[in-house]
Amino acid sequence: MSQNTQTLLITGSAGFIGSNLVLRLLDSQEPLSIVGLDNLNDYYDPSLKEYRLSVIQKKVDTAQRHTYHFIKGDLADKALIDRLFAENRFDIVVNLAAQAGVRYSIENPDAYIQSNMIGFYNILEACRHSYDGIPGSTETGNPGYQGVQHLVYASSSSVYGGNKKVPFSTDDRVDNPVSLYAATKKSNELFAHCYSKLYNIPTTGLRFFTVYGPAGRPDMAYFGFTNKLLKGQTIQIYNYGNCRRDFTYVDDIVEGIVRVMRKAPEKKTGEDGLPIPPYAVYNIGGGQPENLLDFVNILQEELVRAGVLPKDYDFEAHKQLVPMQPGDVPTTYADASALERDFGFTPKITLREGLRKFAEWYKEYYQ
């Protein structure tokens, strides 16, 4: 590997977004040394995670300028995290590992505290200590190493809670979470700001809005609905279909991550002589919220088109309109103007395009 090779840590690399990010990075022109970390837990079918890893491995086998090394491990294992940082000297860290799911956080709160809070703290501490021995850097074992140059981490649109004002802006207050999952994600932003202020670590949080696409998470509506319809089961549509979601295709999410990670917040000194926190938060969302019933209709059409379901499938007999669930919100709607301003990027994939790609993948993978 060249001396100019950047070393990256991608946590949650067998997850939906993480695996797609690794695949995207393996197409990069500049040489990269990528370490992927994932605990491969059974929150959903681990075989889907193994499938994603196999797709990555096929690409790694033909990669000319990159290396990729996967490690099975947990963010909450501080000794493991510290060892990884000591051995690899990461330039960029993208933390996508987390216990996901709003409703699941009501049933299993411990998993969220361990992964989303303690795990994120371990990452922050490791980033902090990556600066040990700098300047001088004789203690680092790599005279040119300058510590972690950028920590990018997954936040969530759920931090907006029950906010009534739409679209959701990063300037809005986000101190009224309606689920433990949302509270842990907001805590990540607070932790990151603290470490940016105290230790001058450049951090950027990304609030993702309803990510979907091929090989996604089976607990997400589009995937779960497909599984149930195929089995002849009834799908439940919350808030009697009056929810709106800002669906964002996974490739758009990944493109946003790649652009952001390459441009860290600038380190500056304030008038008091102390560092101005090199800290930022952005929304990544399509900015076009879809009514849940319209979303279901498009999904149905694309499942029929792909041959997942027959043309004469009785969809009306398999729908049930039900009340809002605890922890849910009626609307998510991203104001992503800051992302466009600073990085020249706006999500582009339409809901129909994205669901078509999902339906075609589903047909190939399961049938």
Located regions from the model:
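Non-catalytic, surface-exposed connector residues within folded enzymatic/regulatory domains
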Residues: 34, 47, 106, 202-205, ...
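N-terminal Rossmann-like NAD(P)+-binding domain of SDR-like oxidoreductases, especially those catalyzing
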Residues: 1-211, 298
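C-terminal substrate-binding subdomain of Rossmann-fold SDR/epimerase-dehydratase oxidoreductases
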Residues: 7, 24, 64-65, 122, ...
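Heptad-repeat alpha-helical coiled-coil signaling segments
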Residues: 210, 216, 243-245
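Residue-level recognition of oxygen-bearing side chains
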Residues: 80, 111, 118, 173, ...
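Conserved alpha-helical elements of sugar-nucleotide-dependent glycosyltransferases
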Residues: 17, 221, 291
